[in-house]
Amino acid sequence: GVTISHLTVERFAAPHDEGVVNHDMADGWVIEHATVQDNSGAGLMAGARQRVRASCLRNNGQYGMNAYKTGDSIRGLVVEGNEITGNNTDDWERRRPGCGCTGGVKFWAVDGADVRGNWVHRNRGTGLWADNNNNDFRIEDNLLESNDGAALMYETSYNAVIRNNTIRRNNWVEGRAYAKDGDGFPYATVYVSEAGGEPRIPARTDRIEIEGNVLEDNWNGITLWENADRFCNSPANTSTGYCTRLVKDTGRCARPAIAAEPLYGDCRWKTQRVDIHGNRFLLDPSVVGCATECGRMAVFANEGTSPDWSPYKGGRVAEAITHRQQNRWHGNVYRGPWSFVAGDGSRTLDSRQWQGTPYRQDAGSSFGPRAGG
């Protein structure tokens, strides 16, 4: 493989969704003690067994790194000890609304990644975004701060450990903009969207474990979400042409087979087996600059409405994510005026309601009125 060390790569032009360093997504590259800055597109692409260490990915037009490889064959990726800052200078979400194509690092169909000891800050959009059939991630000992959007999104993916990260002052820009527009969705700092633990898919864990993190003065906390209308073969599946890791042939996810197990369960990405414990959630609204629209934790789904043949219509998915998919907060510390959203999104709960029936969340957790401590 190629090693790039102690080199500055700057002011190159890559097209949208392409990158400058390792443009052809070759395997086995090592990038260390490098500065990759002020390029258009992504600063880096990625291949299998790539190591990105002690480098600065700064002020690139779209991503710091786009961890996507044609054929979805990235395995064993390491991103360690880097500064990842100021990326998406070309503001692609404004140029292509809803593209989901920006951030510090975007991971796509990566099987096995260690993301540790990075400083991910002041990116325009999401800090770290794992989207579409990623699996077996360890995201540990990072400082994620002051990103315009979520610090971390784990979406339509599987099996991750998110541990011992410091996550502060994220999502102020996007959270405030949504609130100003009257959008009440609890846009999260750690956003788990149609992603969960799956024992049938080999990994170092069979859950999504969120433990030992400090979340301080972010717009919101952790949101566990499912879009009831997003599943294989549905128009609401934005990962066009993809199905879950459990179903190889997307065409099987259709009537009548999808209405019964195993396809009823396996044709959708499920937020399940998420274990949130031993975290500190600190909120001072005077620091964040918000009132009632911030400081929320959430586990919920929308009502299923489409397509016509969907077996997930009505409140089935909301009931499942809230009560039957082993999503559990426990043993956490809260300081500040936190509130909670559960079920179908229409209910905002205080800590007593959240801990009481029927939700029974945050057993063994402590709640206090002030941030800090």
Regions found by a protein language model. Name each.
Residues 1-373:
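Extracellular parallel beta-helix/beta-solenoid repeat domains
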